[in-house]
Design a protein with these regions (language model features):
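Anionic, Ser/Thr-rich low-complexity intrinsically disordered regions
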Residues: 13, 178, 206-207, 221
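Conserved amphipathic alpha-helical segments that form helical-bundle/coiled-coil interaction surfaces
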Residues: 85, 102-169, 177-190, 195-206
Length: 224
């Protein structure tokens, strides 16, 4: 296909990557769907090289699988795999909260300014709240000062993003997130480690169940 002559290959690869990722996130491309490099090149009006770059990047990030004879496939959702990732995430975050409760300088003012606000000041944009939710949980781990723990936690965050973000497509879930984040922060600030950990664990477990429900529903609707 003829590509726009002004576009550099690397920015083209970025555009193809972003578009495919959006297609996967919005269920236009469904888990198990197969396609070839040629299909993508034609649809995106791009040459093979940037398309290949974009596809391999999505494969590295766990969104696609490559089959050398039959092209590419959107990786089927494996809820056992997501379950395992959520379990590891809980372990890391509980350890972080426990450590934060013992620290003199917690440095959580920034998180409080976002989550402990009047109802009228709460945001309701799903994408924005989803990004802020990630920043909240990553922020708790980063606040411990353990860079290796934060790195591992962020890797898991990236792997579960595809299903986790669906939690914020419902207003009731956004409201619950504000309430729960506020309570978790309160408990940490009061250095009540057991309570903070219990609140956090319940918060993540409920979110995990909601996400599974919403994902299965969205897949059923998309498959018609």
């Amino acid at each position: 296909g003829a590509r726009k002559p002004s576009e550099r290959p690397d920015s083209l690869a970025e555009r193809v990557y972003q578009q495919l990722k959006d297609d996967i996130f919005d269920f236009r491309l469904l888990p198990g769907d197969r396609f070839s490099e040629g299909d993508v090149a034609e649809r995106m009006q791009a040459s093979r090289t940037p398309v290949r770059q974009a596809l391999y990047r999505l494969e590295r990030e766990g969104y696609l699988e490559v089959f050398f004879r039959s092209g590419w496939q959107v990786r089927p959702f494996d809820f056992n795999y997501f379950e395992e990732l959520y379990d590891v995430r809980i372990v890391l975050e509980l350890a972080a909260v426990n450590r934060l409760c013992g620290m003199a300088e917690q440095g959580l003012e920034g998180l409080g300014a976002i989550w402990q606000v009047d109802e009228s000041a709460r945001l309701d944009d799903a994408q924005l709240v989803s990004a802020l939710d990630e920043a909240f949980h990553c922020g708790l781990v980063q606040a411990t000062g353990n860079a290796e723990m934060a790195r591992m936690h962020y890797e898991i965050t990236e792997k579960i993003r595809i299903i986790r973000r669906l939690d914020f497509t419902q207003q009731a879930r956004i409201a619950a997130t504000y309430e729960e984040h506020g309570s978790i922060l309160d408990a940490i600030l009061r250095r009540q480690s057991d309570q903070a950990q219990q609140l956090l664990k319940t918060h993540i477990e409920v979110s995990k169940q909601e996400v599974r429900k919403i994902t299965l529903h969205r897949l059923a609707v998309a498959r018609g």
